[in-house]
A protein has these predicted regions:
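N-terminal [4Fe-4S]-dependent radical SAM core
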Residues: 3-4, 9-17, 159, 165-215
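Flexible glycine/acidic-rich beta-alpha junction loops that bind and position SAM and/or redox cofactors
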Residues: 50-52, 118-121, 167, 224, ...
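Short catalytic helix/loop segments, enriched in acidic residues and glycine
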Residues: 21-34
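Radical SAM [4Fe-4S] cluster-binding motif and immediate context
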Residues: 22, 183, 189-365, 380
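Catalytic cores of alpha/beta
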Residues: 121-127, 369-384
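Radical SAM enzyme core and accessory elements
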Residues: 2-5, 79, 404-410, 415-494
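Glycine-rich beta-alpha loop elements in corrinoid/cobalamin-binding modules
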Residues: 33-34, 40-181, 399, 403
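Proline-aspartate-enriched helix->loop->beta-strand connector
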Residues: 77-81, 260, 387
Length: 494
C-alpha cells in the first residue's frame, strides 16, 4: 500500500522556546518496518522541510502551510496517511493534517500515533472527527498490522493496540504486547528524509551546537513510577534495549554514511543497565570511533558509578543531564515517587566535575503535596550543585500530563486551575512556566514567582562563575557563540 507519514508543523505561544528540529525517529522506524514488508512509504516532515513562520490567532506556526501539505498529499496519492502527535500542546496540528488529508480524498485512511493519543485514544477520536484510527503505544508493528488487515479486508478489532471508529461508536482493542527484541528492528529509514536538514546546524538557527549531530534511541520503557511521567503509556514499564553490538554498529552507520559527529541519546533510561552501557562504551573505544555524544533526556544518577563515568568520558561523552526533579528528599520519596537518593546525586556530580564532564539537571516544582519551603529547598539544592560542581539548573513547573498519576491526582483533588488546552500545556512547559496547578498550599502565581526568582539567582550565580573563569568562558564563546548570546540576553530579561 502507499503510505505517507507526516510530522505536522509545530506551534508555539508567546514566551515559548522555538520547538527543536530533531529527526522524527518514530516515523522513521515505522517507515523502515513497512518498507521491509513491501509497502511503498514516503515521509513528509512538515515542520523541518519548510522554514515558514506564520500566525494563527494567538499562536505562531513553524513549518509547511496547509496549502502546501495539501499539494504534497495530492502529489503522492497515499492510501493511508499516518500522523505523529508527540505532545498534547501540538494536538491541533495533528488534527489539521487529518482534515487536509480527508479534504484531498475522503477515502484516505488517517492514522494518528504518539504519546498524547496513547494516553487518551477515545478522547482524541471524539475530538478529531477526521482521524480514523489511533495507535496506542509502539507504532511499528501496529501500523503494519493495520495495513495487512486492510489488504485482507479483515476486521480491525483483531488488531491489538489501536482504537477506531465503528459507526458512531469508538472501539478500543486489546493491548499490544511490547516489542521484546529491539534488535529485530531495522535502522530508521533515514533515506526517506533530507538528512542534511537535521545534521547541519547552519540550517537550524536555534541550535546551540556546531557539530553535525543526530538523535538515537537505544532502549525503551521505564520501570520507575514518577508521578508526572507519561513514558509508560506509550513505551511501557518494562525496560527493553538494543544490544551493545547493535547500538555501536548503528553509530558506525550514521558516522560513515552521514558524517555525524555528535550523537544525542534520547533514551529515557540510557544507563539503567550499566553493564550494557559499559559494553557500548568499550566497543566505541575499541573501534577507535571519533564521535561525541550527549544525554539530553537525562539519566538517573543512581545508574552511574565512577568506573562507568570514566569510560563514558573516554568514549566521547561531552555532557550529562540528570533527572533530579526535587532537592527535597521527602518530596522525591513521597510526592514524586522517584526513589532517588540525593546523596548519590552529589557523589556523581562531584565525580563528573573531577572528570571534566559538563553536567546539567532537571528540576520540577509545584506538585500537590509540596509547600513553599519544599520548593525553596529544591532551589537551594540546585544552586549548591551549580556553585560546587558546575551542574546547570533547568527548572520547570509541574505539568499534569494526561494519563499520568499526577493528572489523576489533580483531577480528583480539583487542583487544575483552568480547562486544559493545547495552549495551557505549551505555556506550562515554558521556561519558568505558567503553572496549571493550585492547591491549599500554594497558588499558581506563587509557584511562578518562586521559579522566576530562582532563575534570576541562578543567572547571577552563573555570571559570577564566568567572571571567575575567563579562560573557560572565552572557550565556550568561541566554540558555541549562540549559547553565550542567549545567556547575555537572559541577563537583561531577568
Amino acid at each position: 500500500m502507499r503510505v505517507l507519514l507526516v510530522n505536522p508543523p509545530q506551534a508555539f505561544y508567546p514566551g515559548s522556546d522555538i520547538p527543536a528540529g530533531n529527526l522524527p525517529l518514530g516515523l522513521l522506524y515505522i517507515a523502515a518496518v513497512l518498507e521491509k514488508n513491501g509497502h511503498e512509504v514516503s515521509i513528509l516532515d512538515a515542520f523541518m522541510s519548510d522554514s515558514s513562520i506564520w500566525k494563527s490567532k494567538e499562536k505562531t506556526i513553524i513549518g509547511m502551510p496547509g496549502w502546501r501539505i495539501r499539494e504534497e498529499i495530492r502529489k503522492r496519492k497515499p492510501e493511508v496517511v499516518g500522523v505523529s502527535n508527540p505532545f498534547t500542546s501540538q494536538v491541533e496540528n495533528a488534527i489539521a493534517v487529518c482534515d487536509i488529508a480527508k479534504g484531498v480524498d475522503p477515502r484516505i485512511l488517517t492514522v494518528v500515533g504518539g504519546p498524547h493519543v496513547s494516553a487518551a485514544p477515545a478522547q482524541f477520536l471524539e475530538e478529531a472527527k477526521t482521524a480514523d484510527i489511533v495507535v496506542i503505544g509502539e507504532g511499528e508493528y501496529a501500523m503494519l498490522d493495520i495495513l495487512d488487515s486492510l489488504a485482507r479486508r479483515e476486521n480491525l478489532s483483531d488488531v491489538p493496540g489501536i482504537a477506531f471508529r465503528n459507526g458512531t461508536a469508538i472501539v478500543q482493542t486489546s493491548p499490544r504486547p511490547w516489542l521484546k527484541n529491539l534488535d529485530e528492528l531495522p535502522y530508521p529509514a533515514y533515506h526517506l528524509v533530507n538528512m542534511e536538514q537535521y545534521l547541519e546546524p547552519k540550517t537550524i538557527e536555534y541550535r546551540s551546537f556546531k557539530d553535525r549531530s543526530i538523535s538515537m534511541i537505544t532502549s525503551r520503557g521505564c520501570p520507575f513510577n514518577c508521578c508526572f511521567c507519561s513514558v509508560h503509556l506509550h513505551m511501557g514499564k518494562s525496560f527493553r534495549s538494543h544490544s551493545a553490538d547493535y547500538v555501536v554498529n548503528h553509530i558506525e552507520h550514521v558516522v560513515n554514511k552521514y558524517r555525524a559527529k555528535t550523537i544525542f541519546f534520547e533514551d529515557d533510561n540510557l544507563t539503567l543497565d550499566m553493564e550494557r552501557f559499559e559494553a557500548i562504551c568499550d566497543k566505541i573505544i575499541e573501534r577507535g570511533m571519533r564521535v561525541n555524544w550527549e544525554t539530553p533526556n537525562g539519566v538517573r544518577a543512581d545508574c552511574l558509578n565512577p568506573k562507568l563515568l570514566k569510560k563514558m568520558k573516554e568514549s566521547g561523552c561531552q555532557s550529562l543531564f540528570f533527572g533530579i526533579e526535587s532537592g527535597d528528599q521527602e518530596v522525591l520519596d513521597t510526592v514524586i515517587g522517584k526513589s532517588l537518593d540525593l546523596k548519590k546525586v552529589i557523589e556523581v556530580a562531584k565525580t563528573c566535575k573531577e572528570l571534566g564532564l559538563k553536567t546539567g539537571a532537571f528540576y520540577i516544582i509545584g506538585f500537590p503535596g509540596e509547600k513553599r519551603e519544599n520548593m525553596l529547598q529544591t532551589i537551594e539544592f540546585a544552586l549548591r550543585l551549580r556553585a560546587n560542581y558546575d551542574v546547570g539548573m533547568h527548572l520547570f513547573v509541574a505539568t499534569p500530563s494526561i494519563g499520568t498519576r499526577l493528572y489523576e491526582q489533580c483531577r480528583q483533588g480539583g487542583y487544575i486551575k483552568e480547562n486544559l488546552t493545547s495552549r495551557s500545556f505549551a505555556e506550562a512547559r515554558q521556561a519558568q512556566g505558567l503553572p496549571m496547578i493550585e492547591t491549599a498550599d500554594f497558588t499558581a502565581l506563587e509557584v511562578k514567582e518562586i521559579a522566576h526568582e530562582a532563575v534570576k539567582r541562578y543567572r547571577r550565580l552563573s555570571l559570577l562563575i564566568h567572571i571567575k573563569s575567563p579562560a573557560k568562558t572565552f572557550k565556550t564563546a568561541f566554540s558555541q557563540p549562540s549559547i553565550v548570546a542567549k545567556f547575555i540576553k537572559s541577563l537583561y530579561s531577568a
